């Protein structure tokens, strides 16, 4: 079936939605308010791409931000594309990164069975480190430390880089020290926190260009729902022709 014939299947959409759905080359950014049908456009665009046989289902990566949203997205894709919809990578950033790291984490020093630390695990680890350093929790609350570590990872800062940023800020220098020990203990335990899953995937791609090329070649289309919530390190390069947002 030619593309013009396939496009008739999307007559229920308005002109702007059709324009987005039928755009299959180069970057695409959709700006619209809540409830305007952005996710519907994403699902229909995937359906259109597959109906036109522009790629295989497993060559599409659809990213969203919560497990609930990812589950709903997967359901809507499978309903729109009964054949092959289940093969599309529809997931959160974290689950996508975990999937990649389970396969290739050994390239950066992790086993395929690495542990993911949740909030309780993180708090316990930081408390142990504070005891090790003889720092009272009242002067340096665990919650504040974890918040600062997370902010550092958002900016892809290592403990050493965080220490340099601290300059004459003794409190931040202490947190940088905790951060350093925290990362060492995580690595020794073959563990990561949720921020690490993102950072380590970036690290993997930076240090193993063959793996980056593998996924770059696999995914012909990368679509991100709620793109405005992306951090710098989770933003796909606009130079990649597969990116649509």
Labelled PLM ranges:
Residues 2-8, 25-28, 36, 47-221, ...:
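A basic/glycine-biased coupling hinge at the interface between accessory DNA-binding modules
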Residues 10-24:
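N-terminal pre-P-loop "Q-motif" helix
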Residues 32:
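The Walker A (P-loop) glycine that initiates the GxxxxGKT/S ATP-binding motif of P-loop NTPases
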Residues 39:
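Walker A/P-loop
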Residues 233-240:
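Conserved small/polar residues in nucleotide/adenosyl-binding loops
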Residues 244-245:
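Hydrophobic alpha-helical segments, chiefly the membrane-spanning helices
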